[in-house]
Amino acid sequence: MSRSTDASVFVQTAYTLRAVWADLWQRKFGTLLTILVIAVSLTIPTVSYLMWKNLHLATTQFYPESELTIYLHKNLSEENANLVVEKIRQQKGVESLNYVSRQESLKEFKSWSGFGEELEILDDNPLPAVVIVKPTSEFNVSEKRDELRTNLNKIKGVQEVRLDNDWMEKLTALSWLIAHVAIFCTVLMTIAVFLVIGNSIRSDVYSSRSSIDVMKLLGATDQFILRPYLYTGMIYALLGGLVAAIFSSFIISYFTSAVKYVTDIFAVQFSLNGLGVGEFVFLLVCCLIMGYVGAWIAATRHIAMMERKE
């Protein structure tokens, strides 16, 4: 009994899908316009999400973590400087550090600055010893980093502590802004998709009014009557999602050359990322849900309105 019921449901579903597809193909121009409107509506939040995704990837790739640069007093002897370094190492929130002595700082400066001969004229080394500190993950948030910076400044022998996170904070703020823009676009375009599907289903319901009346006279259930409209809404949304993914891919490809030009200037390696497989599947699932819900709301409402008028 169960197998025959399953087969009956499968046959009914296949028959309804064929009928819906034949109807959509018969009025293919209107179907194409509806799908394109849905696709454009979905492309906007998809591209906004991809902008946020790529900026977030760039932020984590080029600025994976912030560092604190500590400048020691120049009048410290090498022995006292080592004692200060040990105090810094024992400070809570310090994961690792790299100590560069005054002599090493001068040697590095000579090697890349090209002022080696000029620096030989000076009687005293003008560069301080430097300690580069990597904070622990707990202290890698803004408030904790500031707290660590304050504590390091209190250590005797420390002249200045600089927090190298200006670009990180700017990129994080920009990423936050784009994320909110993406959310706003998603909400607006989701409403637009519901309206487009609802309007299309409304037209289908009123054009099939006589068929609906006949089915009701024959004792058809509401679910049976609604099924073609639900499938129509899901097909609209699914095809719109597929076209939106294609549009998004074209847009990412278009901007890839521009991004490569910029990254070549800055001598870094970065390429734009499109939708992953999981993200693509998630987009299609969301489209199916939107199509189903939008079609159900529109069809139920307008069929009920027709019944009240009768």
From Swiss-Prot:
Subcellular compartments: Cell inner membrane
Native organism: Haemophilus influenzae (strain ATCC 51907 / DSM 11121 / KW20 / Rd)
Function in brief: Part of the ABC transporter FtsEX involved in cellular division.
Annotated TM spans: 32-52, 177-197, 235-255, 280-300
Annotated Gene3D superfamilies: 3.30.70.3040
KW Membrane (keyword) present: yes
Bilayer topology annotation: Multi-pass membrane protein
Cytoplasmic side: 1-31, 198-234, 301-310
UniProt keyword annotations, A-Z: Cell cycle, Cell division, Cell inner membrane, Cell membrane, Membrane, Transmembrane, Transmembrane helix
Gene Ontology cellular-component annotations: cell division site; Gram-negative-bacterium-type cell wall; membrane; plasma membrane
Self-association and partners: Forms a membrane-associated complex with FtsE.
A single GO BP: cell division
Pfam families (UniProt xref): FtsX, FtsX_ECD
Family under the similarity heading: Belongs to the ABC-4 integral membrane protein family. FtsX subfamily.
Principal place of residence: membrane
Protein's recorded name: Cell division protein FtsX
Membrane-side (Periplasmic) residue stretches: 53-176, 256-279
